[in-house]
Structure formats: structure tokens, C-alpha cells
């Protein structure tokens, strides 16, 4: 089972409600939000540094918990949220302050327990396949930070360590 609902928005409220009702009736969690684009952008940029750190740690959660990976990825996630909010012209989400080492530590312990499959194996296969997209996203955060004169030291260090760039 999925942990979060798929997010939907649109100009035709009745149509969006109909889609989400059909999905829920079929067992797929779905919800209506004011702007799915913003919601998805925030969830993506909060997750991406965890994926990059996991890759840097050999796709093992136990290895992510060693050294400063968790501190680095938490800082990168907060920076990415700030950058994304600036790009979209909205406020940072309420959960930004929660993106700290303890939260990502809990995620690193809970991911394999919560997923109905081996999360490490899945993440490695999926994100290796879309690795170029991951690198482009990280580069995009760095370019956005430069253009807006916003902090990106954690993103830059994580990117350098894992991708050498």
C-alpha cells in the first residue's frame, strides 16, 4: 500500500473530484489539492537529496547512517525546498523545519519495513535507470541558487561527492 495519496488539481473542480473518487474506489489513495504542481515539486525536492546520498553510500541505508550523509542530505533538502519555493513564487512548506537528521535517520530505518519490497534494491534499480534525470535535478538546484543568490552549500557538496560535479 502507498503511504501518501496521489495529488490532483485542475480548473474543473468537479472533474478533479470525479477522478480522485474513481481512484480511491479502485484502492488508489488520491486527494484534491489546490496546486498539484507545487505539491509534487516540494515532495520531489525533499526526497531527491536522500536518493543522492543513498547512491553515494552504495545504496545501503546502514551506510547512509554512517558519517555525515544524513546531515548533508537534510541540509540539501532544506535548501532545495527554499529554492523550489522561490522558483514557484510561493512560501516554503510547513514541513521544511522538520527536514533534519533525525527525520532522515527514521526514514533510513523505516523504509525497508514500510515498503512491501526491498526498498534499497528498488531505489537502486529505479534511480540508476533515471540517473541522468537525478543529476540534472541537482544541477538545476545549483543553477537556481546561483541565479537567485540563495544558499546551496549542502546541495553542492552532496552533488560533488556523489557525481563529481
Feature-to-residue mapping (PLM):
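Short, well-ordered alpha-helical segments in soluble proteins
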Residues: 23-30, 53-56, 84
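Inter-helical turn/loop segments and adjacent helix faces that build the functional surface
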Residues: 31, 62-67, 145-152
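Short-chain dehydrogenase/reductase
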Residues: 9, 13, 70-71, 131
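Helix-loop-beta segment of a Rossmann-like dinucleotide-binding subdomain
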Residues: 1-7, 57-65, 118-128
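Active-site-proximal catalytic alpha-helix in oxidoreductases
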Residues: 37-81
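NAD(P)-dependent Rossmann-like dehydrogenase/reductase catalytic/cofactor-binding core
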Residues: 78-165
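Rossmann-fold dinucleotide-binding core
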Residues: 1-44
Amino acid at each position: 500500500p502507498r503511504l501518501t495519496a496521489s495529488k490532483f488539481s485542475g480548473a474543473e473542480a468537479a472533474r478533479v473530484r470525479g477522478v480522485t473518487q474513481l481512484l480511491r474506489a479502485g484502492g488508489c489513495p488520491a486527494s484534491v489539492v489546490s496546486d498539484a504542481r507545487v505539491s509534487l515539486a516540494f515532495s520531489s525536492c525533499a526526497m531527491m537529496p536522500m536518493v543522492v546520498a543513498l547512491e553515494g553510500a552504495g545504496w545501503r541505508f546502514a551506510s547512509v547512517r554512517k558519517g555525515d550523509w544524513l546531515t548533508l542530505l537534510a541540509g540539501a533538502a532544506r535548501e532545495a525546498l527554499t529554492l523550489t519555493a522561490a522558483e514557484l513564487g510561493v512560501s516554503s512548506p510547513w514541513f521544511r523545519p522538520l527536514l533534519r537528521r533525525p527525520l532522515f535517520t527514521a526514514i533510513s530505518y523505516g523504509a525497508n519495513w514500510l515498503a512491501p519490497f526491498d526498498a534499497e534494491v528498488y531505489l537502486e534499480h529505479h534511480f540508476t535507470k533515471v540517473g541522468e534525470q537525478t543529476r540534472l535535478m541537482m544541477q538545476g538546484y545549483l543553477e537556481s541558487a546561483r541565479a537567485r543568490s540563495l544558499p546551496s552549500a549542502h546541495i553542492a557538496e552532496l552533488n560533488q561527492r556523489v557525481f563529481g560535479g
